[in-house]
């Protein structure tokens, strides 16, 4: 390990955190995971059945809910200090869900199964309360703007935070004019800038969607190649077609690139987008000819979460509070990494070893010096990311760094050298060697592209002479067998069932006791709430 490659800034911060009295701060980082996955039939068709009541109410169950569709489940772990407990929690949620799924399966990869016509993809339903109806109309708006097919892509979201005491410690040694909350927000935004610079590395290491079902494209033009079978499209060197420009494409969002210079400019750009009409949406309006809502408003974004990004600054919201309101009022609390594919070879879609590396990587982004992104850097970051998701395993692939080409493997290895001392520090804090082991596993992938998940997906399809759907169904069946043969303990099962029952009661109570405000007025108040925010 060449420590001299580290910046003086990073070395100073690592030395401070590595002091005996401070090392325990690194044990207090929090990790949470959200995993989306489609429910499918035994024949790999979308399960168009309602969200199983035995899983509770999607509106009020904090661990098992739905994302875009009734068929798209989302599993949410609490934020825990030990990532092993986070992964174990995710595993238990899967086992509970499988106990209630009947003959249905959880789809193993990020890219969807063969989908029915758009009108037959069911939008998630959240009941008759105003907030439930708002969530439903928002999803109708997404269908109108982007189509339902795109909304059926699944992923892993990884939430990470440092303890506030760690930021307070770092602030003491740095010349920063604001208060502790401002410094913490400033530091998380700096983390996001570095994440923009280096997140292509995560796509190389963990991208797992090099192929998809041809029907996903709905006849649109593309540059993919047909291979394996008539219904499979792929790119030979792709790592993550999910994160490529095949996914979300939005003319309305094309000019919306929130500035990550500071929290104020970020929240201002999003607030402007949720308050600025967009002509094609205005022409459609908010209601159809029958007077039914079709979208919440005609602005660039209906709500701030509609903005699609690889990482978000976050703050836990109070009841009825919007994400921007929480950020403006109380600053950034954690980041949500949103670009991770589901690994179809893993029952939960993510492993503890991967989690260890992500911790070290995100911590590197947090602790390394992070100048504001110049215009060419923003452009380079976007083009590097797109290059890696579409052809990251291409031999000799070059990326752009400081406006000069650099070999991907050279740059990736340099980044590994810089992340290694952070992994070592995390290991020292926790009395383990797992973070350094994870670095070695990732370096092996850099040295040999065949070890990447994307290459392994294609190799498995080739070895079994099967297309995308057959491969995905086979993996889904393997994982179903694993979860069904490893049931929860009686107490764990009872706890999940009690939580599901409570969530149904909570939704019923909400619907029964809600103040009588008509939905139009409720939406108007919700929209007005964002216009009244002042930084």
From Swiss-Prot:
<protein>
    <recommendedName>
        <fullName>Glutamate--cysteine ligase</fullName>
        <ecNumber>6.3.2.2</ecNumber>
    </recommendedName>
</protein>
<keyword id="KW-0436">Ligase</keyword>
<comment type="pathway">
    <text>Sulfur metabolism; glutathione biosynthesis; glutathione from L-cysteine and L-glutamate: step 1/2.</text>
</comment>
<dbReference type="InterPro" id="IPR007370">
    <property type="entry name" value="Glu_cys_ligase"/>
</dbReference>
<dbReference type="GO" id="GO:0006750">
    <property type="term" value="P:glutathione biosynthetic process"/>
</dbReference>
<dbReference type="InterPro" id="IPR006334">
    <property type="entry name" value="Glut_cys_ligase"/>
</dbReference>
<keyword id="KW-0317">Glutathione biosynthesis</keyword>
<dbReference type="GO" id="GO:0005829">
    <property type="term" value="C:cytosol"/>
</dbReference>
<dbReference type="GO" id="GO:0046872">
    <property type="term" value="F:metal ion binding"/>
</dbReference>
<dbReference type="InterPro" id="IPR014746">
    <property type="entry name" value="Gln_synth/guanido_kin_cat_dom"/>
</dbReference>
<dbReference type="GO" id="GO:0005524">
    <property type="term" value="F:ATP binding"/>
</dbReference>
<keyword id="KW-0067">ATP-binding</keyword>
<dbReference type="Pfam" id="PF04262">
    <property type="entry name" value="Glu_cys_ligase"/>
</dbReference>
<comment type="similarity">
    <text>Belongs to the glutamate--cysteine ligase type 1 family. Type 1 subfamily.</text>
</comment>
<keyword id="KW-0547">Nucleotide-binding</keyword>
<dbReference type="GO" id="GO:0004357">
    <property type="term" value="F:glutamate-cysteine ligase activity"/>
</dbReference>
